[in-house]
UniProtKB/Swiss-Prot annotation:
Designated gene of the protein: era
Pfam family, one: MMR_HSR1
Ranges for region G1: 15-22
Residues annotated for GTP binding in this entry: 15-22, 62-66, 124-127
Name of the protein this chain belongs to: GTPase Era
Residue ranges of the region described as G3: 62-65
Highest taxon, organism lineage: Bacteria
Amino acid sequence: MTKQIQKTVSVCIIGRPNSGKSTLLNRIIGEKLSIVTPKVQTTRSIITGIITLKDTQVILYDTPGIFEPKGTLEKAMVRCAWSSLHSADLVMLIIDSLKPFDDVTHNILDKLCSLNIVPVFLLNKIEIESKYLNNLKAFLTENHPDSLLFPISALSGKNIDRLLEYITSKAKIAPWLYAEDDITDLPMRFIAAEITREQLFLNLQQELPYKLTVQTEKWEELKDKSVKINQVIVVARESYKTIILGKNGSKIKEIGAKSRMQMEQFFSCPIHLFLFVKVRELWENNQEFYQYMKI
């Protein structure tokens, strides 16, 4: 019996916050793995997505958005994004086609050039008519002639098949790093924490979602095939805790119910979710939390 030839290719997806990196990863692997919200800087760490197509395994790295960081957490997120480039065969810079170029995007291009990296450009959100699209195409084509350019819609899936054909064409003969049906290498505890953090982003106003983190402290598989999960939402101030709890605990109950539903859908089993809020001043300066967040 002839042994199957295996190929692998790794792809790093970088770009500004809210340019569509997480939506693209989810679209390609066919699962909602990376959390998505309308707020910027939702992704804090590298999210690895895996899809195996015939003889080729594609490993995708969704990264935190690149911007001008100020605080300790923001700086760690941007460092995390840049660190992912060195482990990838392809670097894809995703650009929001609904916005003009700005200094941050130019700085990203300059840094890629200084690193001798020739990125693939992905002009995203073409499902919406944009007055900037043609100018973006012209600028990139003229100033970066060695780079390929794909207009895509991560949301609708337009041109994603073409993009995948290109990605798989760059695969090299090498043993797969993961099982054929794996979609990520992230621990289930981490994924569960990300699901709850997504609901905190969606259900809390203003800056509060940026001032917290979530840790899964307990994951217990029960005899009836359900899972008991205890999570701690860590905040820096007592006033933040009050907001998250809500009147008579109404807000945290709402967040818990929505998180549990998302977990049951992702993990395909009944979930018993228990949320707790703890105040830890200056948690953003504690390396322990960064290790848990993988940044």
